């Protein structure tokens, strides 16, 4: 509704671009793209994506959720916006319905399949997952860290509020949850599809659905992008069906108290007695056309640190909180300055305001500033793909590995595209080879100094899927040849997994070398050329990723010895356990014990970081170099002297805690 004359409003929904047919449950107004103009974030329930209406600066808005939020909650409920990590940026949290305990997850989590996510993409919906989403703002790109932050599962949740409850200087998080009946209980859902349900009355249905009251959840901000559940230790574990909530200093002691609205029950009022830390409360009196100073921003500075807060009372779900801004200070005894941005053009500053008070500040545009474009951190990298002529798009086939193995943690049939770089044409510039998926040609991107020229590598079999590549001089003619590793978790024909070697004529023209590799049929993950037998030619370690249709059985990693240009499988002679080392994702050579011989570092899925130590003419497993309790989902290894002390260190990439 557009305010026409201060007394009347006009419906301009359609012409403003805000027409929305979703089940919208809440909204928040803030500057999503940091251009100085307020945008609108709308939380939508069910399958429809939430919306980020970006202000076009002409009275219209355009939904561009995908450019800023790469995935979302599936059934988005309440939303709150605040700077929880004190970097000056607005962060966002949206709520969903994922239970906290393993038993309730199995009881309540709906059956999903990968085809559903394909349908989302087909209908231009963005990826959505049944969990809370916490977005940390990094210069208008929002990274979702709810699992890392430990706030992703709080059951059927409604209203989130980010505020500093213990006055330590960092905003904590309180979430209301509950629903009178467990409508998503899988037993009830299955019953509704049965014959008996046809004869049931509405009351019969209601009586069958379980009633489960749950406590709301209070999280302490640990100041490291993680939150700690303090519901019990802060004595707030009261079972309820809670929806709206509001914050206010009800007893005028300086800290924030909480009012919670409960369905068919008495409201909660939580008096805050957590700490005696210092604080500052700020009440802004705005101009005549904005008396509450809505969307004004206050920033306080102390030493090298600062906090920000914005006057935005319309937060959470079906709720409005006060307009007084609260800053916890911990044990700090002074504030250097307080800056108020009344709007995009006017600001004022107060030096050394007293603490432990309610500071009331009347509108005073003493300083004119140009904030129409918020200053952004310069980017470290600039994409130059188009300028350099890197015209390539990987075309992956649809693969549904979960149909054959529902307990797989990921799809192993789309591990590509593989990529390798080297001076293939001998002109002094690095060229690039990109491996194609099944049905797609691999390509050679030849660099001529000013850009790249694309050539299809027709010698590589398009019936196979390229998942690993390595460049090295196979035939000792002074140029780089190509080892092509194939793989696909859905191939049941061994010949589709047989790796190949392509020989380079020195100008980037490749032909397949017949009969140089022995027959072995595994999904390749890494190729390492090195001289294992000391005869001055290059042998090969070829690690294996997964065994098709036999997950999680270990595939066989092989060691191939170069004998007069033909590779012989010497795996049993050199590798422990006949090469059945696990589902390997990466490997690197490194002289671990300083004996002058190359050892092998390996890692993979459901395993740790392991050393294959060279002992005379074979390798043995030696687990004494790494901690025993580091099993996990490891992806990659990089060897480098990171601390410049003359020895080699490791960077090992894991699936991570945000998962």
Model-predicted segments: where are they?
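Beta-propeller blade repeat segments, especially FG-GAP/WD-type strand-to-loop junctions
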Residues: 1-12, 49-64, 106-111, 131-143, ...
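Solenoidal tandem-repeat scaffolds enriched in leucines and small polar residues
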Residues: 1-30, 34-37, 43-45, 518-560, ...
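Short glycine/acidic-enriched loop and turn motifs that connect beta-strands
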Residues: 47-48, 98-101, 180-182, 266, ...
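Repeat-solenoid scaffold signature
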Residues: 59-98, 122, 126-179, 240-277, ...
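Short loop/turn motifs that recur once per blade in beta-propeller domains
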Residues: 10-22, 62-75, 115-126, 143-154, ...
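Hydrophobic beta-strand segments that make up the repeating blades of beta-propeller
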Residues: 35, 39-44, 92-95, 173-177, ...
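Beta-propeller blade termini
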Residues: 2, 25-34, 54, 76-86, ...
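Gly/Ser/Thr/Pro-enriched helix-cap/hinge segments flanking short amphipathic alpha-helices
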Residues: 141, 211-217, 221-418, 451-452, ...
């Amino acid at each position: 509704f557009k305010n026409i004359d201060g007394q009347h409003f006009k419906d301009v929904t359609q012409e403003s671009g805000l027409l929305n047919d979703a089940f919208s449950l809440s909204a928040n107004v803030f500057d999503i793209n940091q251009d100085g103009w307020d945008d609108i974030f709308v939380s939508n329930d069910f399958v429809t994506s939430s919306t980020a209406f970006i202000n076009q600066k002409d009275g219209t808005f355009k939904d561009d959720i995908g450019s800023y939020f790469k995935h979302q909650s599936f059934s988005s409920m309440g939303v709150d916006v605040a700077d929880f990590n004190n970097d000056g940026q607005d962060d966002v949290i949206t709520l969903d319905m994922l239970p906290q305990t393993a038993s309730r997850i199995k009881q309540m989590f709906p059956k999903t399949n990968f085809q559903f996510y394909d349908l989302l993409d087909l209908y231009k919906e963005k990826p959505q997952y049944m969990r809370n989403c916490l977005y940390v703002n990094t210069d208008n790109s929002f990274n979702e860290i709810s699992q890392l932050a430990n706030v992703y599962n709080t059951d059927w949740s409604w209203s989130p509020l980010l505020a500093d409850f213990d006055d330590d200087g960092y905003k904590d998080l309180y979430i209301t949850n509950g629903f009178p009946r467990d409508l998503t209980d899988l037993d009830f859902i299955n019953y509704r599809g049965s014959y008996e349900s046809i004869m049931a009355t509405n009351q019969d249905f209601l009586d069958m659905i379980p009633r489960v009251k749950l406590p709301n959840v209070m999280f302490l901000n640990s100041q490291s992008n993680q939150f700690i559940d303090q519901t019990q230790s802060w004595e707030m574990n009261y079972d309820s069906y809670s929806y709206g909530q509001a914050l206010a200093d009800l007893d005028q002691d300086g800290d924030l108290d909480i009012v919670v609205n409960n369905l068919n029950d008495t409201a909660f009022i939580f008096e805050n007695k957590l700490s005696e830390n210092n604080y500052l409360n700020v009440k802004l009196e705005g101009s005549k056309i904005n008396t509450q100073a809505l969307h004004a921003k206050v920033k306080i500075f102390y030493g090298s640190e600062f906090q920000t807060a914005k006057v935005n009372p319309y937060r959470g779900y079906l709720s409005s909180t006060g307009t007084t801004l609260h800053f916890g200070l911990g044990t700090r005894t002074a504030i250097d300055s307080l800056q108020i941005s009344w709007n995009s053009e006017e600001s004022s500053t107060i030096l050394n305001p007293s603490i432990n008070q309610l500071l009331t500040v009347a509108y005073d545009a003493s300083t004119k500033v140009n904030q129409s474009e918020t200053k952004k951190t310069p980017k470290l990298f600039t994409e130059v793909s188009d300028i350099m002529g890197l015209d390539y798009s990987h075309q992956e086939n649809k693969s549904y590995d979960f149909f054959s193995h529902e307990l797989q943690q990921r799809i192993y049939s789309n591990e590509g595209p593989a990529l390798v770089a080297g001076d293939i044409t001998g002109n002094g510039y690095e060229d690039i080879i990109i491996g194609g998926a099944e049905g797609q040609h691999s390509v050679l991107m030849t660099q001529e100094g000013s850009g790249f020229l694309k050539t299809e590598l027709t010698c590589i079999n398009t019936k196979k899927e390229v998942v690993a590549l390595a460049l090295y001089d196979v035939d000792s003619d002074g140029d780089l040849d190509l080892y092509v590793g194939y793989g696909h978790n859905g191939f049941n024909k061994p010949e589709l997994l047989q790796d190949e070697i392509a020989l380079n004529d020195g100008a980037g023209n490749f032909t397949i070398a017949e009969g140089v590799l022995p027959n072995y049929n595994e999904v390749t993950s890494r190729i390492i050329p090195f001289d294992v037998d000391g005869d001055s030619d290059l042998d090969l370690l070829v690690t294996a990723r997964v065994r098709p249709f036999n997950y999680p059985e270990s595939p066989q990693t092989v060691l191939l010895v170069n004998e007069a240009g033909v590779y012989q499988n010497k795996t049993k002679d050199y590798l422990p356990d006949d090469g059945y080392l696990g589902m390997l994702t990466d490997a690197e050579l490194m002289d671990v014990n300083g004996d002058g011989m190359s050892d092998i570092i390996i890692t993979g899925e459901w395993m740790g970081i392991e050393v294959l130590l060279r002992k005379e003419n074979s390798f043995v497993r030696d687990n004494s170099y790494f901690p025993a309790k580091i099993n996990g989902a490891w992806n990659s290894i990089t060897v480098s002297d990171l601390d410049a002390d003359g020895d080699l260190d490791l960077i090992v990439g894991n699936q991570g805690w945000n998962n």
